[in-house]
Amino acid sequence: MYKNIKKFKLESFIAQEIGNLIVSRGIKDPRIHSFLTVVKVEFSKDLINAKVFIGSIKEGASLDNAVKALNNAKGFIQSQIIKRIKVRSTPKLLFVKDDSLSKSFYVNKIIEGLNTIREN
């Protein structure tokens, strides 16, 4: 039970810190824009590896390039996280593209289209 609570707190903290770095432009890479969002963070059972799912709230944004840039900057990101958290070792980060936001935008467009057809 305790490990699950610790894991949940660590996942939410990591997501928040990475989100803050993205929004505050702490990562100096033009491929990383403020429309990126951390969808979720999943830790391995041993809390050594963390998979960070990245989405974009802007339609048509180049998510592939942003994920590559984040993976290139993961050493810097890990160093920033270790300054703010008290753990024995920093989790190894892996950034992964998450299309769930773009899919939800697509579904919303379809629903809006159906609503306009219904109104006419």
Curated annotation (Swiss-Prot):
InterPro entries, sorted: KH_dom-like_a/b, RbfA, RbfA_dom_sf, Ribosome-bd_factorA_CS
A GO term for molecular function: ribosomal small subunit binding
Gene: rbfA
Function (record text): One of several proteins that assist in the late maturation steps of the functional core of the 30S ribosomal subunit. Associates with free 30S ribosomal subunits (but not with 30S subunits that are part of 70S ribosomes or polysomes). Required for efficient processing of 16S rRNA. May interact with the 5'-terminal helix region of 16S rRNA.
Keyword annotations from UniProtKB, A to Z: Cytoplasm, Ribosome biogenesis
Broad class of the protein's primary localization: cytoplasm
A Pfam family: RBFA
The name this protein goes by in its record: Ribosome-binding factor A
Similarity comment: Belongs to the RbfA family.
Subunit structure: Monomer. Binds 30S ribosomal subunits, but not 50S ribosomal subunits or 70S ribosomes.
PROSITE patterns assigned: RBFA
Signal peptide span: none
Gene3D superfamilies: 3.30.300.20
Gene Ontology biological-process entries: maturation of SSU-rRNA
Localization in the cell: Cytoplasm
Gene Ontology CC: cytosol
